[in-house]
Regions:
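Flexible "arm" and connector segments at domain edges
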Residues: 1-61, 65-109
Length: 109
């Protein structure tokens, strides 16, 4: 498999879910997955705020990415297509400065 392929990454995460029987043991429960993603985001935040090495940050981001791919599997949606649909919407938006920082979102004051 091509390690740069979305399908290869998704297949690896699916194999991990299957190996540990996530579907039958609560590992695919969406509320649980949200809690795990929040935990990983906290670890990413700690890497940034504590000035940890780039490798530590990369590992935590990979953990979050794996959880996101697993959530797409659990919730049965096509993350690849959803990504491209969302990018198309984002590309159509105008950027603006808010509190001295660029935003390209539907941020409202």
């Amino acid at each position: 498999m091509n390690p740069d392929s979305y399908r290869a990454m998704l297949a690896a995460v699916q194999a991990f879910h299957d190996k540990h029987n996530f579907k039958a043991t609560g590992g695919e429960e969406l509320a649980y997955r949200v809690a795990l993603m929040a935990e990983e985001l906290g670890e990413i935040s700690a890497c940034v705020t504590k000035g940890k090495p780039k490798e530590a940050l990369a590992e935590e981001v990979a953990d979050l990415f794996i959880l996101i791919l697993g959530t797409a599997i659990s919730a049965e949606f096509d993350l690849n297509q959803t990504f491209w649909d969302k990018m198309q919407k984002l590309e159509a938006r105008q950027s603006r400065m808010i509190n001295g920082r660029i935003r390209v979102s539907e941020f409202r004051d």
